[in-house]
From Swiss-Prot:
Annotated catalysed reactions: (6R)-5,10-methylene-5,6,7,8-tetrahydrofolate + NADP(+) = (6R)-5,10-methenyltetrahydrofolate + NADPH; (6R)-5,10-methenyltetrahydrofolate + H2O = (6R)-10-formyltetrahydrofolate + H(+)
Stored PANTHER family: C-1-TETRAHYDROFOLATE SYNTHASE, CYTOPLASMIC, C-1-TETRAHYDROFOLATE SYNTHASE, CYTOPLASMIC-RELATED
Organism encoding this protein: Mycobacteroides abscessus (strain ATCC 19977 / DSM 44196 / CCUG 20993 / CIP 104536 / JCM 13569 / NCTC 13031 / TMC 1543 / L948)
Pathway(s) of this molecule: One-carbon metabolism; tetrahydrofolate interconversion
GO terms (BP aspect): L-histidine biosynthetic process; methionine biosynthetic process; purine nucleotide biosynthetic process; tetrahydrofolate interconversion
Superkingdom as given in the UniProt entry: Bacteria
EC number: 1.5.1.5, 3.5.4.9
Coiled coil regions in record: none
Keyword Cytoplasm found: no
Cellular component terms per the entry's GO annotation: cytosol
Keywords: Amino-acid biosynthesis, Histidine biosynthesis, Hydrolase, Methionine biosynthesis, Multifunctional enzyme, NADP, One-carbon metabolism, Oxidoreductase, Purine biosynthesis
Family membership noted in the UniProt record: Belongs to the tetrahydrofolate dehydrogenase/cyclohydrolase family.
Subunit structure: Homodimer.
The protein's name: Bifunctional protein FolD
Length: 281
């Protein structure tokens, strides 16, 4: 068996066509959505991510607002920049690119974002709304995972999903999305400290690996025909690699590659959150 590739790039391109149509309709109605970014420091990876997001804006037809700050700024300067975007009518939604330099308080910065302008969907208020089933910007990576599985007709209703990783960007909110009535999956949330992880993953219809441990999910941990979504990101020999080993492709029914799987959809749903807010306003 060779697994079907869950192609995030092709799926992203399909979403971009739809988003461009919606952005054009908003412009025709006198509304031009704008995505803002706040980037602190000189981290090459962060700069690459931010460049990609602004390139995406150009493809879809969104305005983009970029605030690049030196690494040695203080907390007050960062907070003032956040306040500026909160008040900027041209900024429909924005993100603070993480990680921040260690001397800055990430939680304070993220909580200062106007929840209605939270393009990442990770503000505590919006995560609380997700728990309550209320309308709010959804976390981009979990939303992308669910969309990608549906795009390839991977059955979610009644499925047992094992999520490996307990971070706030993927693992925790993904469980909330998958257990909504619209998805109706059963979720087991695991992490690097879970005992006998393989016994749990072998029961899973879907495995989502988001622990950041290179090649931790191997073929002997996967039920034949299961779907495996690789979200982990690590560097091995100066190359980006995921949490899923190559031999999994010989056992699984579906595999999302990494890179090229969920990552493009994370960026697509960042723009989706911005456009949706413009449509609601």
């Amino acid at each position: 068996m060779t697994a079907t590739r869950l192609d995030g790039k092709a799926t992203r391109d399909e979403i971009f066509v739809e988003l461009a149509t919606r952005a054009a309709a908003l412009k025709a109605a006198g509304k031009t959505p704008g995505l803002g970014t706040i980037l602190v420091g000189d981290d090459p990876g962060s700069h690459a991510y931010v460049r990609g997001k602004h390139a995406d804006c150009a493809k879809v037809g969104l305005n983009s607002i970029r605030r690049d700050l030196p690494a040695d700024i203080d907390q007050a300067t960062l907070c003032a920049t956040i306040d500026e975007l909160n008040a900027n009518p041209d900024c429909t939604g924005y993100i603070v690119q993480l990680p921040l330099p260690k001397h800055l308080d990430e939680n304070e910065a993220l909580e200062r974002i106007d929840p209605d302008k939270d393009a990442d969907g990770l503000h505590p208020t919006n995560l609380g709304r997700l728990v309550l089933g209320k309308e709010a910007p959804l976390p981009c990576t979990p939303r992308g995972i669910v969309y990608l599985l549906r795009r390839y007709d991977v059955k979610l209703d009644g499925a047992h999903v094992v999520v490996i990783g307990r971070g706030v960007t993927v693992g925790r909110p993904l469980g909330l999305l998958l257990t909504r009535r619209s998805e109706n999956a059963t979720v087991t949330l695991c992490h690097t400290g879970t005992r006998d992880l393989a016994a749990l993953t072998r029961q899973a219809d879907i495995i989502v690996a988001a622990a950041g441990v290179p090649h931790m999910v191997t073929a002997d941990m996967v039920k034949p025909g299961a779907a495996v979504v690789d979200v982990g990101v690590s560097r091995v020999d100066d190359k980006l690699t995921g949490d899923v080993a190559e031999d999994v492709w010989d056992v699984a029914g579906y595999v999302s590659p990494n890179p090229g799987g969920v990552g493009p959809l994370t960026r697509a749903f960042l723009l989706t959150n911005v456009i949706e807010r413009a449509e609601r306003s």
